[in-house]
Amino acid sequence: MGSQSSKAPRGDVTAEEAAGASPAKANGQENGHVKSNGDLTPKGEGESPPVNGADEAAGATGDAIEPAPPSQEAEAKGEVAPKETPKKKKKFSFKKPFKLSGLSFKRNRKEGGGDSSASSPTEEEQEQGEISACSDEGTAQEGKAAATPESQEPQAKGAEASAVSKGGDAEEEAGPQAAEPSTPSGPESGPASASAENE
C-alpha cells in the first residue's frame, strides 16, 4: 500500500483508489481479503456498497457464520466414533512350547475354551494339570523312579520328549515335575526334584 502511493504523484489519486480504499477498510477487508481479528462488528461502519458485491456477501456472512464450531465438533465426533468401536484384540497363541524361569508355557487344546486362561495358564492351573497327568501316567513312572531316584532328570526329559511326540496336552504338562510326587520318600528325592524345578 505504501509502495503504491509513493510511486503515484500525491495529487493524482484516481477515483477507483479513493472509492476502493475507504469502503474496503470500513468493512474490514484489505486487498479482497477479510481481516478477522475479533474486533469487527457484525455490520461494517459504513453502509456504502463495496466495489465488488461478492466481497460484501462473503464479509457479511463471514461475520454472521457461527455454525463453524458445530462442524468442528462433528469432525471431532467423527474422530471419536472409531474409538467408540474398539478393535477386537488378537489372541496371542504359542506356536512352540517354551520355559521361562522354571515355568513351562505350552499350547493348550481345550474344547470350547474361548477364555484367555486357556492360552496362558497360571502356575496353579499348571500344577493341577500336572497332578492329573501324574495320576494318569505317574503309575508307570513310579516303578522306574523308585528303583533309581538318581535318574529322575533323564526320565523327566524322556517323558517330556515322549509326550511331545504323542501330542497329548496332559502329558506335555507332566514334564519334569512328573517324577516329583512319585517318590515321596528318600533323602535323594528332595534335591533332585528341586534341581528339576530350577531348570
Curated annotation (Swiss-Prot):
**Entry-annotated residues carrying Phosphothreonine:** 14, 85, 148, 183
Q: Where is the composition biased (Basic residues)?
A: 86-98
Residues with PTM Phosphoserine: 22, 36, 48, 71, 93, 101, 104, 119-120, 132, 135, 151, 162, 165
A single Gene Ontology molecular function, please?
A: actin filament binding
Q: Which InterPro entries match?
A: MARCKS
Write down any Gene Ontology CC term. Answer: presynaptic cytosol
Q: Which Pfam families match?
A: MARCKS
What UniProt keywords apply to this chain's record, in alphabetical order?
Actin-binding, Calmodulin-binding, Cell membrane, Cytoplasm, Cytoskeleton, Lipoprotein, Membrane, Myristate, Phosphoprotein
Q: How does it sit in the membrane?
A: Lipid-anchor
- Biased composition of type Low complexity is found at 16-26, 53-64, 175-199
PTM section of the record: Phosphorylated. Phosphorylation at Ser-120 and Thr-183 is non-redundantly catalyzed by MAPK8 in vivo. Phosphorylation at Thr-148 is preferentially catalyzed by MAPK8 in vivo, but this modification can also be catalyzed by other kinases in the absence of MAPK8. May be phosphorylated by protein kinase C, which disrupts the interaction with calmodulin.
State the residue spans of region: Disordered: 1-199
Where is the stretch described as Effector domain involved in lipid-binding and calmodulin-binding?
87-110
The answer to whether keyword Phosphoprotein applies is: yes
According to the Swiss-Prot or TrEMBL entry, at which residues is a lipid covalently attached (N-myristoyl glycine)?
2
* Chief localization: cytoplasm
- Which spans does this entry mark as compositional bias, Basic and acidic residues? 74-85
Q: Which protein family is it in?
A: Belongs to the MARCKS family.
Its function, per the record, reads:
Controls cell movement by regulating actin cytoskeleton homeostasis and filopodium and lamellipodium formation. When unphosphorylated, induces cell migration. When phosphorylated by MAPK8, induces actin bundles formation and stabilization, thereby reducing actin plasticity, hence restricting cell movement, including neuronal migration. May be involved in coupling the protein kinase C and calmodulin signal transduction systems.
How this chain assembles, per its entry, is: Binds to filamentous actin (F-actin), but not to monomeric G-actin, independently of its phosphorylation status. Interacts with calmodulin.
The name under which this protein is listed is MARCKS-related protein
Species whose genome carries this gene: Rattus norvegicus (Rat)
